[in-house]
Amino acid sequence: MGSNKGILRAVLSLVVDDGAYQSEQARVALHEAQGLSVELQVLYAANDPLTQSEQLLKIIQGPKEDRPDVMLLEPVGTALPHVAKAATKADIGWVLLNRVADYLPELRTASTAPVFAVTDDQQEIGRIQGLQMKALLPDGGSLLYLQGPSVEAAQLRTQGMMATKPDNVSLRMLRGKWTEQSGFDATASSLRLRSTVDAQLDGVFAQNDLMAQGARRAFIELAPDRVNSMVFAGVDGLPFAGQAWVRDGRLAATIQMPTTAEIGLRLAVKALRTGTQPAEVTTVAAKSFPDVSAIKPLRKAAHV
């Protein structure tokens, strides 16, 4: 599994090029690559699983001398089992970010290249959101809940949230695509429905900070009389985005979700240079920002 080359080559495949968390994944990976003397190519799949698959297969099936030593990817849809198999057959390492897959044990047994996953605990992220709801709405209430696309991460976050959400908090489910615009569009469509116009809503929880911001913008533009009496919350919690938005009052809470790309790259490089196989799954911990105990309840009397 070890490489004889002084400089290793890696490919990082990310979901979109305009998301705060995805941009931070690229930034930290490029910084880590520089320190590790790794040539890193970053690809973006434009939120399209077919594009992601085609981009990676094109590299795998290209000239041997141009192939990377390892591929790291945050899957758009499925964890691309056929691409993973093709990569490991070509002796290319395979690292899943923020996802685990049933095929990992089999590929690890058959491959001489490193095969593993580095992931945030997606269910725990959801559980934290449920606790934030309880802190913000101790007497219950009604929220719009903006889920991401129908992929595992979004599903697990929803499952975790439902496990800790208070029974007296009701949800109306909406669907976005992780982008601010998709959060705006989903919320704006809902606000055009009479059922939403007439509803007593206390806020919007979204599965990432950008969708939460998009939802807030929709209320500012379409229901400005309601926005100041509502709470908005998301996930990612980057210092320059979610955390900053909590500090300036645009969000009531977020969840700090550590980046995983630099960890995956570091573990892969160590594996390639030492001939060892990392643990099958490395999990990093998320946390509420601010801490759940410090979240101030929404003042219901503020409703107009």
Residue spans for each PLM region:
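Extracytoplasmic "Venus flytrap"
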Residues: 4-28, 32, 41-57, 75-78, ...
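Hydrophobic alpha-helical segments within soluble ligand-binding/sensing domains
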Residues: 52, 115-142, 183-187, 237-242, ...
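Flexible loop/hinge segments that line or gate small-molecule binding clefts
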Residues: 83-124, 239-247
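Hinge/cleft segment of the Venus flytrap/periplasmic-binding protein
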Residues: 6, 164-165, 256-304
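Hydrophobic alpha-helical
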Residues: 70, 74-92, 176-244
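Short, low-complexity disordered leader/linker segments with a strong preference
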Residues: 1-9, 64, 87-90, 304
